[in-house]
From Swiss-Prot:
GO CC term, one of those recorded: mitochondrial inner membrane
Subunit structure as annotated in this protein's UniProt entry: Slime mold cytochrome c oxidase consists of at least seven different polypeptides species, subunits I, II, III, IV, V, VI, and VIIe/s in order of MW.
Function (record text): This protein is one of the nuclear-coded polypeptide chains of cytochrome c oxidase, the terminal oxidase in mitochondrial electron transport.
UniProt-recorded name of the protein: Cytochrome c oxidase subunit 7e
Annotated compartments: Mitochondrion inner membrane
Record key words, sorted: Membrane, Mitochondrion, Mitochondrion inner membrane, Translocase
UniProt keyword Translocase present: yes
Catalytic activity: 4 Fe(II)-[cytochrome c] + O2 + 8 H(+)(in) = 4 Fe(III)-[cytochrome c] + 2 H2O + 4 H(+)(out)
C-alpha cells in the first residue's frame, strides 16, 4: 500500500515552483522592457540633440 503523502508533497512543491517562476519572470520581463524603452528614448533624444547642434 503506497502513501498519498509523497505525491501530495511533490504536487505542492511543483505548484510552488511554478508560481515562483511566474512571479519572478513577469516582473523581470516588464523591467527589461522598461529599461529598453528608457534607453531608446535617451538615444532618440541625443540623436535629435546632435542634429540641432
Amino acid at each position: 500500500m503506497s502513501h498519498a503523502l509523497p505525491a501530495l508533497i511533490k504536487m505542492h512543491i511543483t505548484k510552488d515552483i511554478g508560481y515562483g517562476l511566474l512571479l519572478g519572470i513577469i516582473p523581470g520581463v516588464w523591467f527589461k522592457y522598461q529599461i529598453g524603452q528608457s534607453i531608446q528614448k535617451r538615444e532618440d533624444f541625443y540623436a535629435a540633440y546632435d542634429k540641432r547642434n
